[in-house]
């Protein structure tokens, strides 16, 4: 690795994350691109998260512990303040990366110097670590993709790599628990081209931890986002019809799930 190789800051936010953390950290340590630092923000964990992290013996680590539970995107912003990298990436503790994820993305940026944001396809894992499916079967959009994102938001934060300066000028809305990345990347897509690697470079894990609670928060945040941003996007020539329809379907599915669980 030459001295001119860009430094990558990997942002990892954790809250009682011992279950999958070791597997996640192993995927980071196996990266073929070695010039990275890990910014680990422990969001008031009460389990063995810190012990698992210590056992990993990651040398290029910056560890921070919050003395109170913060909303996720508030915690992400605080972690970002500690980052020194030229590029920023995000890896949550229940997910993992392919070993060449960072290398492929750095090489893509080198070949496309006008780009500031990049994402990729990914696999979805179930709780038993088995690949459940490839998330996106069709080609992912690239370039100016705001219209597409409003119809089908395809960017997963664990696949994103973004220019440090751009992210520091446009931080996450810290009031969000779930849709902070949606809010940020959608707004950035109006001003910047977004690059795509069609190859799946990450593994997103689905599990039942607080699932119903998270769905309710997601619906509430998305409804609030539409209310606050609809006029701005319409004035810019975009339609939020598909997004509102998606929210409607999500509400219906959640009600049905609740009825089934209650045995009504």
Predicted regions and their residues:
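A conserved acidic beta->alpha catalytic loop
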Residues: 27, 42-51, 92
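Short beta-strand/loop segment that forms part of the nucleotide-sugar
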Residues: 36-44, 64-66, 93
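Conserved donor NDP-sugar-binding/catalytic core segment of glycosyltransferases
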Residues: 100-132
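Acidic helix N-cap motif at the loop->helix transition within catalytic regions
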Residues: 19-22, 47-55, 96, 100
């Amino acid at each position: 690795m030459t001295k001119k190789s860009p430094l990558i800051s990997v942002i990892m936010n954790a809250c009682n994350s011992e279950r999958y953390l070791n597997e996640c950290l192993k995927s980071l340590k196996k990266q073929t691109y070695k010039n990275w630092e890990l910014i680990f923000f422990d969001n008031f964990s009460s389990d063995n998260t810190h012990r698992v992290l210590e056992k990993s013996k990651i040398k290029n680590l910056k560890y921070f512990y919050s003395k109170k539970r913060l909303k996720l995107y508030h915690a992400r912003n605080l972690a970002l303040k500690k980052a020194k990298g030229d590029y920023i990436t995000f890896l949550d503790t229940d997910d993992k990366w392919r070993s060449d994820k960072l290398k492929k993305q750095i090489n893509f940026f080198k070949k496309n110097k006008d780009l500031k944001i990049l994402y990729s396809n990914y696999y979805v894992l179930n709780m038993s670590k088995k690949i459940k499916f490839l998330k996106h079967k069709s080609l992912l959009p690239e370039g100016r993709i705001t219209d597409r994102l409003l119809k089908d938001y395809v960017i997963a934060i664990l696949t994103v790599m973004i220019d440090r300066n751009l992210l520091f000028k446009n931080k996450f809305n810290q009031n969000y628990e779930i849709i902070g990345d949606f809010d940020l990347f959608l707004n950035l897509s109006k001003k910047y081209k977004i690059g795509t690697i069609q190859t799946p470079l990450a593994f997103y894990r689905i599990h039942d931890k607080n699932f119903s609670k998270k769905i309710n928060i997601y619906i509430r945040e998305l409804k609030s986002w539409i209310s606050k941003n609809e006029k701005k996007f319409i004035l810019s020539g975009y339609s939020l019809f598909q997004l509102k329809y998606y929210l409607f379907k999500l509400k219906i599915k959640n009600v049905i799930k609740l009825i089934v669980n209650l045995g009504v």
